Amino acid sequence: MRSDMIKKGFDKAPHRSLLKATGLKDEDFDKPFIAICNSFIEIIPGHKHLNEFGKLVKEAVRAAGMVPFEFNTIGVDDGIAMGHIGMRYSLPSREIIADSVETVVNAHWFDGMICIPNCDKITPGMMMAALRINIPTVFVSGGPMAAGKTSKGEVVDLSSVFEGVGAYQSGKISEEELKDIEDHGCPSCGSCSGMFTANSMNCLCEVLGLALPGNGSILAIDPRREELIKQAAEKLKILIERDIKPRDIVTEEAIDDAFALDMAMGGSTNTVLHTLALAHEAGLDYDMSRIDAVSRRVPHLCKVSPASNWHMEDIDRAGGISAILKEMSRKEGVLHLDRITATGQTLRENIAHAEIKDKEVIHSLENPHSEEGGLRILKGNLAKDGAVIKSGATEVKRFEGPCVIFNSQDEALAGIMLGKVKKGDVVVIRYEGPRGGPGMPEMLAPTSAIAGMGLGADVALLTDGRFSGASRGISVGHISPEAAAGGTIALLEQGDIVCIDVEERLLEVRVSDEELDKRKKEWKRPEPKVKTGWLGRYAQMVTSANTGAVLKVPNFD
């Protein structure tokens, strides 16, 4: 066993002595040592129940004849961090999480790992670590939150609350109505109930094969999630016996399938960023053009909030992720069904008995929302290395208009609230990319304000930052190269005409190459917003969004 490094041989007497101080007995040294990587944090609703969750995982590991050791990671609640300096720390926290898990697990030579994530950057951070460490691993997330209901019976979620702010600001609802939405938008523990980033990543974890069937859709408060815990411990033991590791599971084909599910569900645009980072950790050469190829062959089968009034509980009721995958598998060439997963079985075997139980929620191949996926990769002179739009969250497929430029999210939000944005405008929020932000903050507050004011179909928003999974409308993010790297978005001037063509996958500014070259020569890189601390270091090391915004290792040659 891998853990023999710290427990076998006469020279490991000091190590065993220390381990006995934690409560171990001699007989425990013949059992696999299992890292329980938890993320219990009281300020995050999706994680406040994970303390008890961790206890159940440890019980299940002991029952399977293994020895559990629990530790915790940090986390950031993107909703609470939204709209202020805290959002700069969200994406960088992914790297800290990955590094911290790598540190604990490799320092103590565990034989296997069960990861308990749930929310936005915590799931991909742990997944990156699992691929980096590459020991048998199973993921069991904390589960989605249920949707809420206002006193009038209206179904609401977190995106309803954000959009309620814009609606109140524009006089569409009263303060009492906003308070009613606030009080009921997040009714329980769990990851926010729509197809936002947390749930998108937990669903992708399931299709990648690192988590068990049901991981993405079974609610946090559903007793079936406890059954998942028991299964996870049993399956981990099998993975250890068969030496099946994350890099055996997360192949190029698995990533294709993850993006295929993402397209079928219209998941968060953040999945592109995180899954490219996973490919990097797995040592795979996977670029955005391959994502676009997946998008072209996968139909959009279900719309989940914010693209509709359906939520994760409805997806679960309709058959869950397995039912979506089973329906997708009917179309030749969409999925790679014979690859191994954390169940010890193939994807084909995992979904063999799944079926759609509500075709209003999960559409059939014969009745898709669209013939192509709910995410699109756009390119053009404004995004030479690519940009991402959640095409399934807008009915508008082509938009052209003059740009209104803001050099920060704060500046943009103030301008929107002051009425500086009107119908037909293209709002540009720049210098908010991985380096420029720093941290590539999400733009949920501006998009929600625009939607809440009733301008969601009449105003487009472009940014080198990110969008929350709760964002909707004509929102193009991840524009690469970013402004801080001298990308074309930095060269835009007020009133330049920008064209977004979703069907043709184009993002263009109607300015000649000669004029752009002239502007590039005159452009000067702004001073970094942050020069010290973690964010200062992050801004120096982070790479572009089109490569997953991973950190580059200095070249020592």
UniProtKB/Swiss-Prot annotation:
Q: Name one GO biological process term.
A: isoleucine biosynthetic process
Q: In which pathway does it act?
A: Amino-acid biosynthesis; L-isoleucine biosynthesis; L-isoleucine from 2-oxobutanoate: step 3/4; Amino-acid biosynthesis; L-valine biosynthesis; L-valine from pyruvate: step 3/4
* Annotated transmembrane regions: none
Where is the PTM N6-carboxylysine found along the chain?
Answer: 121
Listed EC numbers: 4.2.1.9
InterPro entries, per the entry: Dihydro-acid_dehy_C, DihydroxyA_deHydtase, DiOHA_6PGluconate_deHydtase_CS, ILV_EDD_C, ILV_EDD_N, IlvD/EDD_N
Q: Give me the residues that bind Mg(2+), please.
A: 78, 120-121, 442
| A Pfam family assignment | ILV_EDD_C
Catalytic residues per the record? 468
Q: Which GO MF terms does the UniProt record name?
A: 2 iron, 2 sulfur cluster binding; dihydroxy-acid dehydratase activity; magnesium ion binding
Kindly list the positions annotated as binding [2Fe-2S] cluster.
Answer: 119, 192
The UniProt keyword set, sorted, is:
2Fe-2S, Amino-acid biosynthesis, Branched-chain amino acid biosynthesis, Iron, Iron-sulfur, Lyase, Magnesium, Metal-binding
Query: So what does this thing catalyse?
Result: (2R)-2,3-dihydroxy-3-methylbutanoate = 3-methyl-2-oxobutanoate + H2O; (2R,3R)-2,3-dihydroxy-3-methylpentanoate = (S)-3-methyl-2-oxopentanoate + H2O
Which HAMAP family does the entry link to?
IlvD
The family classification in the record reads: Belongs to the IlvD/Edd family.
Query: How the protein assembles, per its UniProt entry?
Result: Homodimer.
Question: Mind telling me what this protein is named?
Answer: Dihydroxy-acid dehydratase
Q: Which organism is it from?
A: Bacillus cereus (strain ATCC 10987 / NRS 248)
Source gene? ilvD
